[in-house]
């Protein structure tokens, strides 16, 4: 087909389109918005910020979005580990919406009957509330407030667990985060009101998640995955990232052998502190989790006929698989 007949939203030009040219075509109102605030995008460089939105991963789940190791837990949406390195944004939104609907269907057909031991659950809940209450009382005496503790963890994650990674930085970050988490369990972080108490409890969860994530990233780098997705791995023996960048910016190239594999991380716990808090297992330089790669689940090769598939749906057989 001649190029002139292909619908195209951009001006046809023999030269590559610049960002401002694309913006003039796609969303000229944005240019005017900046002009209204004294910024001319045609003349001034625009500072950009980088976020780790596509640092994908999540809880392992079945094709019905049920956790593979915690029955009756349904991690739906971007908390699910089905979001891969190169997934498009539309599929992520679709997975959340369709996943919630499918999970609700599965729950209605498989878990409609009451299965909770109320007495045992109440006893466990009371024990946990007692533990957390003790921790919160302990935390009031801490000389570190929850805001400072949170910021230290966030800065470390942005520096080591985002788009630019290196093994030496990750080694240090894992050790620092393990120390932070152990101190957090022993001493807590101070707060001044009920909202601060909630945030202090969030610090426990966030720091544990940060530690587990950093350990998983370190394992991936050690395994030789290389630079892929939304992260580059700095390597002095790697390839030059760009001719205008110095030797600091040499990166480990992607190892394509990992494209059909998924990294699985399983957390371990050992003893508890007197307050009931879970302690890390072993030395802080060792993972409190195990990591391994397994093959991605293949897309099923199905030759179902409509009549049989519809019958299986009507009779509820689909919820048995």
Regions found by a protein language model. Name each.
Residues 90, 131, 153, 158-162, ...:
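Sequence-pattern detector for short linear motifs
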